[in-house]
Amino acid sequence: MLALLLSSLRARAEPEPEPTKPVLRTRDASLASILRGPFPSSRLFSMPAADTVGAYVLTLSGDASLLQQPGALTSAGLLAIGFGDIAQLEYRHTSAISVTGINAPLPAVGVQLKIPIPERPNVPAFGIAFRLGVPRTEIFGDTNVEETVTDFYLVGRLRFELARWLTLHGGARISSAKIELSGDRMFESSRRLVLPTGGYELAMNPTAKIIGEIALAPQFMWDPAGTADPKIDYGLLGRFGFRWAIVPSFTLDGSIGYQVDVASAAPDDGPSAIVQWDIRLGAEVFVPWGALACRAAGVFCD
């Protein structure tokens, strides 16, 4: 990862090429032209972008790390299917901090929409996303802990005509977080949180970019050995890394993430406020299933 970043930094930052329209879904389209894209990503790392994967396109992405919790594989993933140019259905892991204190993403199903505003230079694009949380259960002795987060996102994306290598992202995440204890202890609590989120993309060349994001996220807090009831607060999650398109339909990414306990951190703590960090490697695959089905069987054609 470091070698790729250094080589990219040595290269002159070229502007991103103008987005081109996908090849029409026709029976005579070549396989090479179908897989040439373009294939926009609908995410930074965990933050949604104001874009969808495109009509009749499926994307599968994931990343994992062994460093965040020694001896345990922590991972997150996304499966999205585009229907039309502005909508996609998805199953994904949304960011949250579990009672164990680590960034343990929670499963969710939802829909993401791009607001249909004509693309113009220096005019932001906007998107919304709704994610219905799926409960995740952790077991501590005879106590079951169930954590759920349901989210609504409003995000924006801005590209500059004079600096096409730079893309800014920002928005807000409205989360309804719930924690429930069962088994030998009974307790239930929920809280609504408004969480700002932001990020950026720096295009180093037409196939590689540096990506960063920072956001507040729900944090579940409970000590199984204590007598206090669980509570829901918020923590800060940041991530910085690269994304490299080996071919248009397949990208690799690597990133360094960190976690700050906002509730207990003092303004002058500096780096000591970081309570967790990790290194994650991942990939994203785009499958233009509509164009492939049209070429093979004459269905889903334009």
Stretch-by-stretch model annotation:
Residues A3-L5:
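Intrinsic disorder and flexible/low-complexity segments
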Residues E14-E180, D184-M186, L195, E201-D302:
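Transmembrane beta-barrel domains of Gram-negative outer membranes and organellar outer membranes
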Residues S189-R191:
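Short loop-to-alpha-helix "cap/lid" segments that border enzyme active sites
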